[in-house]
């Protein structure tokens, strides 16, 4: 039986635009291809729906024009909102700049999604076949208390799958929060930059042991030098005691599962038009296929294909449909 994907992340509105280069302080530039679209965790849930799997959003949505756009978009895409509403605040928004090299820069506001009370996720009770997607961005807002309450409530008897996207915010969460996520043992899904940040946090925990500290510092240096390889990913997996996925762009993704050797699952090189949302696409397809019982290695391979197609299109929510992914893979999944 196929489950559903439940997001505990945040849905906001993306104001996207293209620029030749991100402006310097005091500079005035004109942008092109300006669009207003619902984004953040919506991009992940959109990818889930493109795979034909049910999706629910449990985050807080506010009251106001941004919130209205979010609710309408969720309804249009068949995504159920199972979270709380904030009658006082509007939802947040983000300005996303994509430069001529397809790199992106973000400026975000905090809206209702960031101010959830500690009981915000108390009504979320995933079933065994469900996949819960957690975003590191939630851990740096007040809604973190609700997320940590959910994690603690479900740790001991958790039967569902949890996928954690640490985001760059993993560098700023306090040690107790970091340890809580370590103890939860989700599937960690990150890019190379985030892998570096995770390694740095793990190395800091090893400071009390000179042997472990030396090894961890060597690994951190390898990752910082953009040398994500079998050894570094295996080390991350061992220290996290959980499956680890490290996305490496057109080269695909590294996967390490406790007890198995780390392996690189090849990507599908494409000419990138816009990398905005590629990671969200990867995560959504991964979660959707795990709901269907697809083995983790195969799910990562499909996610690689989907995100490769996604970067050939402009916009934050550009996940291809299932048939397009199957054509690229040359098989049905």
Where are these regions (language model features)?
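Conserved N-terminal subdomain of the carbohydrate kinase-like
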Residues: 26-28, 50-134, 158, 327-333
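Glycine-rich phosphate/adenosyl-contacting loop at the front of the ribokinase-like
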Residues: 1-60, 65-72, 76, 271-273
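Active-site metal-binding loops of divalent metal-dependent hydrolases
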Residues: 11, 137, 281
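Conserved phosphate-binding/catalytic region of the ribokinase-like
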Residues: 2-6, 200-333
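Short, conserved phosphate/pyrophosphate- and ester-handling motifs at nucleotide-, phospho-/glycolipid
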Residues: 48, 191, 279
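Structural detector of well-ordered beta-strand residues that form the stable sheet scaffold
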Residues: 6, 56, 162-163, 189, ...
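Conserved beta-alpha-beta core of the PfkB/ribokinase-like small-molecule kinase fold
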Residues: 131-228, 234, 251-253
